[in-house]
């Protein structure tokens, strides 16, 4: 079976420059790579053709021979003896560029790992959350060794270049037709080895410590808010950047107030005479007591809004409100005189369901009467 033309395989003209050939190869190799087409024999065969064409057309000597003699230039007895395209080509460059991010290859020394991020759960009272507070916290962490300054090597020595990968952090492994780069098993990709480890950190470059931090909590935070302290996480390996510390806010339940966004809610009990006749009562706010005027004929559950007495948003903007929900209390512990007065009051209303003085009761009982009338029809 005749072999396909190398230029046709890559989809380029016979006058294509090397950069065009390389670009075409990258595109096709990405499409037909075996790792992206597992179990697809046709894709695997196509990938081999693409690699063969790329190797020939990016080698000036081989390309010239191919242009003059075609595939015959590489058959037994042709150019270079031995034929084929198995000798000498190093695909580490193209593989690093094309497949590094996708298949974990890539070139060069593995970067030292950034330090891990840490999390701290901080409980605040409502007052602390609303006004802001500065608190000291203690957190266990890994810090850079102060003896070797993160290198892991004993004082007076330094890490040595890995003899296996010669400092590259990777080694090339040939698996049949393919040449694959892998992390160096000797140095784990660092490119260096520590022959004389530091006596304090034993070569790790980091030591366990508990550090104390002063954390400023801004006014207006709420449960679920998270504060990031850059660089206050664990130290990175061998001089790599430190991680971050995230302070997670949890606001404790308050005895009086409930928070909803930037608004505060509280229940204000009033007796039935104030509800009926109106009056004035002191209610609590986070800034102290204020006076609330209750109009006559106030029903239980009515909300009174006190503007600007809520929480100032941590992100700026208008301050929230305080909403007072009145609860009309039924009197208890009545003496005989009080009971008699209430009976007289009830009679003046025209009975327990006085129509003129209890509109909701009238509406309710009218509805009940209609319901039963409809049932008996």
Swiss-Prot record:
Cofactor binding, note field: Binds 2 Zn(2+) ions per monomer.
Compartment list: Cytoplasm
Domain comment, as recorded: The J domain is necessary and sufficient to stimulate DnaK ATPase activity. Zinc center 1 plays an important role in the autonomous, DnaK-independent chaperone activity of DnaJ. Zinc center 2 is essential for interaction with DnaK and for DnaJ activity.
The organism's place on the tree of life at top rank: Bacteria
Domain J: from-to ranges: 5-70
Main location per the UniProt record: cytoplasm
Cofactor: Zn(2+)
Function statement: Participates actively in the response to hyperosmotic and heat shock by preventing the aggregation of stress-denatured proteins and by disaggregating proteins, also in an autonomous, DnaK-independent fashion. Unfolded proteins bind initially to DnaJ; upon interaction with the DnaJ-bound protein, DnaK hydrolyzes its bound ATP, resulting in the formation of a stable complex. GrpE releases ADP from DnaK; ATP binding to DnaK triggers the release of the substrate protein, thus completing the reaction cycle.
Protein name per UniProt: Chaperone protein DnaJ
Organism: Klebsiella pneumoniae (strain 342)
